[in-house]
Amino acid sequence: MSKTNTAIYQKIAEKRANLERFREFKELTDDLVLQLESIGDKLETMNGGTASVALILANWKSVVQSISLASLALMKESNDNNKEAFPEPLVRVRVGQSNEENQDEEEADEEEGVRDSEEVEESTE
């Protein structure tokens, strides 16, 4: 009977050791899940950032060309006249907006202009 008790206690000890290893394994996998989720969030952030950088780089060529054109015009003007020459102002025009959005922006700008002029009148009185 003592041998069977010893065998049973040995099996119980093995099961407890296995249980402890499984608990440790579960803790490690939970930590791994948290780290992978964190990496996933960081990758999403990086993805948004790379999209912004790609957009900037896609427009960079046209920006450099615009600056170059303005500089060339300035050089030609300075060669023709002895007056002090200033570069031509560069204006950004949105091409991808719908007419409705343009009208909304114009109305908002007009309202802001009216408010600004009213504030000026009040301050002068």
Swiss-Prot record:
Residues 79-125 are annotated as: Disordered. GO terms for cellular component: cytoplasm; DASH complex; kinetochore; microtubule; mitotic spindle midzone; mitotic spindle pole body; nucleus; spindle midzone. It is found in: Nucleus; Cytoplasm, Cytoskeleton, Spindle; Chromosome, Centromere, Kinetochore. It comes from the Eukaryota. Disruption phenotype: Cell cycle arrest in mitosis either with unseparated DNA or with unequally segregated chromosomes. Abnormal spindle morphology. Inviable. InterPro entries: DASH_Dad2. Its main location: nucleus. One of its GO terms (biological process) is cell division. Keywords: Cell cycle, Cell division, Centromere, Chromosome, Chromosome partition, Cytoplasm, Cytoskeleton, Kinetochore, Microtubule, Mitosis, Nucleus. Residues 101-125 have a biased composition (Acidic residues). Component of the DASH complex that connects microtubules with kinetochores and couples microtubule depolymerisation to chromosome movement; it is involved in retrieving kinetochores to the spindle poles before their re-orientation on the spindle in early mitosis and allows microtubule depolymerization to pull chromosomes apart and resist detachment during anaphase. Component of the DASH complex consisting of ASK1, DAD1, DAD2, DAD3, DAD4, DAM1, DUO1, HSK3, SPC19 and SPC34, with a stoichiometry of one copy of each subunit per complex. Multiple DASH complexes oligomerize to form a ring that encircles spindle microtubules and organizes the rod-like NDC80 complexes of the outer kinetochore. DASH complex oligomerization strengthens microtubule attachments. On cytoplasmic microtubules, DASH complexes appear to form patches instead of rings. Belongs to the DASH complex DAD2 family. This is DASH complex subunit DAD2. It comes from Candida albicans (strain SC5314 / ATCC MYA-2876).
